[in-house]
């Protein structure tokens, strides 16, 4: 079951779009949002120390202005250092095949193409989530 999510995105307006989409889809959960990879890494350290419960799923923007690393590097770090069972993927307006390949290499399980009309993509993701959690579903692009 999908109870908690972390959205890492530098666009505060998209935080609202994402939250509204979750509400429209009856995804009732704890949603945390941060605007930089640095803030996300601080949360990851809290997961590792047990100070904070890990989210079930992490959505990371590809290009996050003002961050020390890009979204793909954050995906790699979360997967290899802090992840241990967290479903993680990229959410970006880009659908560049080279970037998608880098994301899969870093350990991303999915890629959602960002838009103002994100609900249909999130709805498909929501139905696929159990497959990602059980690691029986392979990488997928939602566009």
Where are these regions (language model features)?
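Acidic, metal-coordinating helix/loop segments flanking the phosphotransfer/catalytic sites
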Residues: 19, 33-57, 121
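A short, hydrophobic beta-strand element within the central beta-sheet of small alpha/beta folds
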Residues: 84-95
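Short amphipathic alpha-helix used as the core "switch/output" element in two-component signaling
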Residues: 69-84
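Active-site residues of response regulator receiver
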Residues: 60-63
